[in-house]
Amino acid sequence: MIRRPPRSTPLYSSAASDVYKRQSKWCAAGGWRLGYFVIPESLNLLRDKMKVLASETFSSVSSPIQYAAIKAYNSDHKTYLTKAKKILKGVGDYVYENLKSNNTIINKSQGGFYLMPEFINKDFSNSNEMCDDILKKTGVALLPGSDFGLLQEKMIARLSFTDFDGVKFMENIEVNTKIDKNLLSEFAPKIVNGTKRLKGWVEST
């Protein structure tokens, strides 16, 4: 399969595309729910309908969030984003490389901070029961795939590899630093330990 870098649809049809951007992911502000739409004049009818819908759905964002957003949108984030992507790729690749096996179907993360492993050697009545067993036996908390519309009988779980101090990690690397196991053991020990425990659970009978 040939993978090509993602391209934004406005590059092909700017007059028929609206752009939505939010701070929750790239700015690590998950609870803020702040973002914006850029809508071309050709879609003014859509814009007007969305304004009506928005006015009936939520009120204005709190002042502290607005001030923080102004600071965020007026700063240069190149170094931050480069380091964040490097760290998440390093952590995600580590988890992937340690979990992939004949007993686990898993795809490498192409962005973000989630993996969706399928444990094909496990036989539970549903993925929720499987995740309960993982938590009980390893202390690793995963969400069942059924919570995301996947078949309950599929032993799939969503794994988030973000249980580490990102600020501390960033402060101790440069943009060209290679993320290896030594760094992960120092700045993401819970990831290393949790992955080891989960791998042990997979290999257990």
What residue spans do the PLM features occupy?
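Short, solvent-exposed loop/turn elements at beta->coil junctions and helix N-caps
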Residues: 23-24, 104, 145-149
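Conserved core segment of the aminotransferase class I/II
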Residues: 18-86, 96-97, 177, 181, ...
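Generic structural signal for small/hydrophobic residues in well-ordered secondary structure
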Residues: 17, 35, 69, 88, ...
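Short, conserved charged micro-motifs
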Residues: 123-129, 167-170
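Single conserved hydrophobic/aromatic residue that forms the stacking wall/gate
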Residues: 1-16
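Residue-level recognition of strand-loop junctions within catalytic nucleotide-signaling folds
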Residues: 40, 74, 118-121, 162-164
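PLP-dependent enzyme catalytic core of the Aspartate aminotransferase-like
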Residues: 133-142, 148-205
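Conserved glycine-rich beta-strand-loop-beta hairpin in the small C-terminal domain of fold type I
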Residues: 70, 87-96, 106-119, 155
